[in-house]
């Protein structure tokens, strides 16, 4: 299990280990702060490469804050490996390839891809086990470690955090609520003519 964030994020890794993960890696450094999607993906890519070899990387589909669903695919692009998004389940694992089912909204697609690869999974793809109290009591914190900038292969701080981010968020705000609703009780051609008139008035047509 690997995540990126401040030291408080170590609690997330502990929870994952209580649920059955073998180990956890926290990629954390002051210079990682302020990272956009691109810089976050690059940082995680560096952290994964530091962690060792792999067959499949599993990522959540999207975060609950930025909600972009871009980090997983961008990690794969930085690593030069194939990736599948919105994965519902894994139907078969071969020696060098994996078969997955993806939710493409209007259809379900079955796809086979070479390993190593990266998959972003739907939240309902499985039912996570509950944290084990016994595992919590017996767990050694030796399975958790932190990786900082000086331990990555690319140690140029300009490639991380705010300096390495091609985009910056100016502000976050809820959409404006508008109350100028209009109920139209026409039907047929009268309704169609009225809608065309409104669209022309607003210069959509």
Language-model features: locations:
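N-terminal glycine-rich FAD/FM-binding segment characteristic of electron-transfer flavoproteins
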Residues: 1-205
């Amino acid at each position: 299990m690997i995540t990126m964030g401040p030291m408080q994020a170590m609690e997330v890794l502990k929870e994952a280990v209580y649920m059955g993960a073998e180990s956890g890696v926290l990629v954390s450094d002051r210079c990682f702060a302020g990272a956009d999607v691109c810089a976050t993906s690059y940082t995680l890519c560096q952290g994964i490469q530091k962690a060792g070899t792999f067959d499949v990387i599993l990522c959540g589909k999207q975060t609950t804050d930025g909600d972009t669903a871009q980090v997983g695919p961008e990690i794969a692009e930085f690593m030069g490996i194939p990736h599948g998004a919105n994965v519902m389940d894994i139907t078969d694992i071969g020696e060098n390839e994996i078969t997955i089912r993806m939710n493409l909204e209007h259809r379900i697609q079955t796809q086979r891809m070479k390993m190593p690869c990266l998959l972003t999974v739907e939240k309902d793809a499985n039912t996570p086990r509950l944290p084990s109290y016994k595992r919590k009591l017996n767990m050694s914190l030796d399975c958790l470690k932190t990786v900082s900038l000086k331990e990555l292969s690319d140690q140029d701080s300009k490639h991380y955090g705010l300096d390495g981010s091609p985009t910056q968020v100016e502000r976050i705000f809820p959409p404006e609520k508008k109350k100028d609703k209009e109920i139209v009780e026409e039907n047929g051609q009268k309704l169609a003519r009225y809608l065309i008139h409104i669209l022309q008035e607003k210069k959509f047509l």
